[in-house]
Amino acid sequence: MKYQMNFTTSFDDVTRFTSAEDLRRFYKEHGCDGLEVMPLAYSTKEAPEVYQEASVCPLIQPDMVTGVHCCCLQDWMNQNKEELITHYRKDLDYATRMGAEYVVFHVVQVDGEESFTYQMKHTNREVIDAAASFINELLDGQTYHFWFLMENLWWPGLTFENPEDARALLKQVHYEKKGFMLDTGHYLHTNLDLHNQDAAVACLHQMLDNHKDLIPYIKGIHLQESLTGEYAKQWLADAPHELPEDPAESFRVVYEHIFQLDRHEPFTAAGVKGLVERIDPLYVTYEYITRSREELAEYLERGRLENI
């Protein structure tokens, strides 16, 4: 089992570290073997408005990268397929250059309006069928060697609420080294009545009970908790919500709402270690959203399995 810290090549993340060795010392000090990298546009303190390819980021060396998280598009089903292929191949090529052992791909379809209003336009199975077809277009005939791990969210797509949906996704995807990346916090969003981490662990065990035959396919875990059911209930009670007409303002309020929902905080309940042991994945990524290097260090220590 390998342990990763999530990291992006964005300005907010890279400016926390002074060099590749500084970054390496940091994640090793906090119990990680390497990084799960999302290759976003790279910029520096000296020129924050100049965006460069992720591959030029000097902080990240190939021997530091265990996994690559694709820069996933949540609203994609009506977009041009050739452009989508180009978008994702760029990330897959980055993963290949870095020697990544796995990549992560979101199986979801949601637009800004849906995430804001909760009025969904597709069923889980519709999204799963479309995603499987697209994944086959993306991967068929290629010579990739990494695991292709499909991640759950709480919007239409792979949610782990129905084992038949997960089985259908696996069955339809041709790629041999396929599996799941279970995001624990994302799954918790499917139950708005959870109020503490012990209940969250029990909820995840119940999901595993329902997916027993699929547990061997869970090759990775994004280990985090996000108990925001009360926020979601209040949001729904205050409906209807209308998006601003201005695109920039609309983008801002949607993501402000999403970050209130999906907090990515340390999962520290006593039962978390047993949950991970039950799944026995190849990879565990401590996937957090933090505001500083100091907060990231605090989160990594709190969520570190050996400290629970």
Which residue stretches match the model-derived regions?
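Histidine-acidic metal/acid-base catalytic patches
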Residues: 1-2, 85-90, 99, 175-182, ...
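N-terminal pre-domain/capping segments
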Residues: 1-96, 306
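Acidic-and-aromatic substrate-binding clefts and catalytic sites of carbohydrate-active enzymes
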Residues: 10-21, 37-52, 74-85, 113, ...
